[in-house]
Amino acid sequence: MSGSYGDAAAWEFIDWNDPFEVDEQNAHLAKHPGLCLDDALDVAANDPLFYEACAGPADWLMVAEVPGGDVLVVPLAPSNYSGYMKMRPIGVYPASGELLDAYLRDREDQSDA
């Protein structure tokens, strides 16, 4: 069963102790030196914000500041096997451009609330 996270209510079904579906296709997530699945787990564990993806195979972009101060983005595709219980990460990248600006603005708005 596959799942799409178009409905925000679906996020409540994620197993946050083991959030990712990883197989041979996405086992080598990082295209940037020094980034790996552990970095994606850091993003998931550090109060991420979610943004709808505009293009490509990802439905959502999970963004968070990780230990060390870097802001990383993990594109998420629908699960191939686990329905709504797992997210399927398809990369780990440093956040940049408009996405980084939106994340920093949204975090600032949260701290002002």
Question: In which residue ranges do the predicted regions lie?
Answer:
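Ribonuclease/tRNase effector modules and their secretory precursors
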Residues: M1-A113
